[in-house]
């Protein structure tokens, strides 16, 4: 893959030969103008990000955005993993990269990697003016000036949805507590009967360590995201942000997707309609506990929460539930 650093998009550059795209189809960093802009496959593209906690609706936001012909959003890239590596590279006092000019060069290289990786996916949508990443993660600005969509969902619904998925696929959160007897028992029961939690909803949140961990992680991300959004609004961080809750989007997807297009400077009238096939209408058909497209409803936590689970959640995330506006007190 050949790349060229140039501010002149007409300057000839080697092609992406591995993809056999022709002489004019390359990726190039543009050093002038907006920092979230890149030259990709014959034209400039602008880059954006969709973030939120896992099981909060980042996939849905992406699907809604892609109903507009000028938007393509792919993922998940998990650039935060790469960022940790670059930060470690520049952290230790005996690392040369802690001092200039290597420090600035390393940051520039990280940002260039983000730009080029996202822009490379524009090959799948040649007409896209905007190309994005939809990784579920805390809000962190990797490209100065880039627009960010941040979605927040009731942590109790997140807990239910993520618990079912993690137990079903033995995901990374499950693996953290796989030695917990209560959690191992739940997975055994699920593997024997994929309808186990539908038949026994009071059993889902019976592993205290697992339940508290997910609630704690959700609370930590809510705190971080809200604080970061405040800094963006105050001008302390160079970015723009569109924040929305899953519940708002669920109640009126047409209104809010129009606002999302306008946030990127696009005409909502050009967007395609929402359809069941594109998975852009609220909720999903059925309730398949083996699928990551399980249900998508609001308030599903009422079915699964016991008094014990409520107590665990309030202790781990009650303050953040109130801060996010889902409750006015812990008396729920």
What are these regions (language model features)?
Residues 144-165, 313:
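Conserved phosphate-donor/acceptor-positioning beta-strand/loop module used by diverse small-molecule
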Residues 113-141:
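Glycine-rich phosphate-binding loop used to anchor ATP phosphates in small-molecule kinases
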Residues 1-119, 125, 168-189, 291:
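PAPS-dependent sulfotransferase catalytic core
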Residues 56-62, 80-83, 139-142, 156-161, ...:
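Short catalytic/ligand-binding loop motif for oxyanion handling, primarily in non-cytosolic enzymes
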Residues 302-332:
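C-terminal accessory extensions appended to soluble enzyme cores
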Residues 31-35, 42, 160-163, 167-259, ...:
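PAPS-dependent sulfotransferase catalytic domain
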Residues 48, 72, 147-150, 242-244:
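Hydrophobic/aromatic beta-strand patches that form the interior of the parallel beta-sheet core
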Residues 85, 231-307, 311:
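The conserved 3'-phosphoadenosine-5'-phosphosulfate
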């Amino acid at each position: 893959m050949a790349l060229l650093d140039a501010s002149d998009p007409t300057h000839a550059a080697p092609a992406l030969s591995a993809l056999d795209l022709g002489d004019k189809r390359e990726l190039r960093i543009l050093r002038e103008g907006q920092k979230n802009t890149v030259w990709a496959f014959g034209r400039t593209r602008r880059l954006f990000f969709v973030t939120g906690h896992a099981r909060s609706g980042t996939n849905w936001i992406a699907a809604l955005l892609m109903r507009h012909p000028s938007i393509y959003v792919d993922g998940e890239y998990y650039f935060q993993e790469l960022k940790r590596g670059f930060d470690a590279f520049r952290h230790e006092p005996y690392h040369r990269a802690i001092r200039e000019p290597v420090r600035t060069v390393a940051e520039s290289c990280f940002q260039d990697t983000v730009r080029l990786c996202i822009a490379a996916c524009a090959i799948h949508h040649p007409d896209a003016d905007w190309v994005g990443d939809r990784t579920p993660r805390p809000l962190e600005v990797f490209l100065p000036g880039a627009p960010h969509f941040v979605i927040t969902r009731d942590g109790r619904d997140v807990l239910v949805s993520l618990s079912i998925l993690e137990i079903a696929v033995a995901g990374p959160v499950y693996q953290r507590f796989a030695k917990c007897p209560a959690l191992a028992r739940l997975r055994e029961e699920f593997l024997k009967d994929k309808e186990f939690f539908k038949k026994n909803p009071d059993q889902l949140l019976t592993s205290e360590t697992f339940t508290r961990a997910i609630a704690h992680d959700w609370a930590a991300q809510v705190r971080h995201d809200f604080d970061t959004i405040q800094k963006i609004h105050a001008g302390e961080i160079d970015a723009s942000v569109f924040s929305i809750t899953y519940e708002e989007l669920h109640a009126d997807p047409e209104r809010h997707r129009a606002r999302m297009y306008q946030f990127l400077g696009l005409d909502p009238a050009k967007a395609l309609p929402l359809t069941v096939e594109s998975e852009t209408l609220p909720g999903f058909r059925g309730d398949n506990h083996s699928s990551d497209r399980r249900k998508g409803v609001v308030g599903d936590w009422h079915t699964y929460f016991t008094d014990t689970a409520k107590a665990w959640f309030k202790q781990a995330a009650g303050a953040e539930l109130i801060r996010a506006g889902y409750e006015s007190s812990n008396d729920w």
